[in-house]
């Protein structure tokens, strides 16, 4: 099986798989600058902390700030709900943009790996560092790819989030 490794949002073409890739998405009635913004908006317990995160000057700084939240600022149940939220955010991202839909579907059966370079707990959860990690972002993308491919089998157009 072939493998597609991605990490930096600026790397063509598969940097678009990064949550830091700058592409607006509509999620839960709000327009977010990136899928990272949509994902992290669910993490804070307090609206003031959410606003502070959403005002970060870049998606990378947003991610760093969100990873450093104190436990009392994190929504109850986040550790168990975050994967479902990421699944929903990715579905919104890849169904709202035909080019991203085609890019994901075009990876065929390749293993998708977020290949991080800095070894830490977060990078080993969402990706792999030196081949070690759960690669949850890659796993969720492959799950979404299979779902979208099955839904698209009888259609000539991409699936919209409303469908």
Tell me what each language-model feature is:
Residues 1-163:
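Charged, low-complexity intrinsically disordered segments
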């Amino acid at each position: 099986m072939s493998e597609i490794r991605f990490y930096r949002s600026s790397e063509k073409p598969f940097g678009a798989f990064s949550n830091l890739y700058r592409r607006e998405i509509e999620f839960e009635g709000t327009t977010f600058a990136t899928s990272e913004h949509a994902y992290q908006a669910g993490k804070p317990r307090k609206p003031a902390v959410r606003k502070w995160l959403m005002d970060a000057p870049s998606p990378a700084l947003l991610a760093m700030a969100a990873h450093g939240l104190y436990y009392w600022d994190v929504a109850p149940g986040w550790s168990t709900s975050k994967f479902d939220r990421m699944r929903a955010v990715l579905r919104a991202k890849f169904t709202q943009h035909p080019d991203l839909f085609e890019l994901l579907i075009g990876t065929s059966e390749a293993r998708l790996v977020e290949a991080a370079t800095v070894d830490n707990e977060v990078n080993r959860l969402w990706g792999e560092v030196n081949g070690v990690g759960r690669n949850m972002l890659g796993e969720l993308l492959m799950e979404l790819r299979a779902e979208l491919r099955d839904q698209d089998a009888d259609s000539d157009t991409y699936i919209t989030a409303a469908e």
